[in-house]
Amino acid sequence: MQNQVAQSMKNSIKVYLVNSFTRDHCGGNPAGVVLNPPKLTTEQKIAIAQQVGFSETAFVYSGDDTDFKVDFFTAEGEVDFCGHATLAVFFTLSSLKLLKPGDYSQKTKAGILTVTINHDNIVMEQTLPITRKGPCVNDVAKALGILPEVIEKTDL
């Protein structure tokens, strides 16, 4: 992973620019990391994510019942979880010597997940994916003449 720092123009918020899944500091999947930001509205987080310009930006807070609370934002809104941004968060915390090797818990919209920092890597826990069995929602919606979102809201 590699790490750079950028300043958000608004509110002088420090954003770490981190590439996860790199080899020899090349390539990877970029994410923004904001550590202990001031109280921000959803709109402000979206604006920062837009300014960062990566697929996700993580906002990291001290947790009440976990080690950390992490919010993930895209340029369009909040998402439940982001794997490469999670790795970016813990790489940043470790690089800044704020964390030692060990197990840490993070609260996300996807639930409470464990992240393990080792001397040479970071491993994260993810919830099992939800798989849907049955006909394609888009096909059913088209046949019924309704929007797919109507069916998706039912969780069927």
Mark where each language-model region is.
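Active-site proximal loop and beta-alpha junction motif in alpha/beta enzyme cores
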Residues: 3-81, 87-156
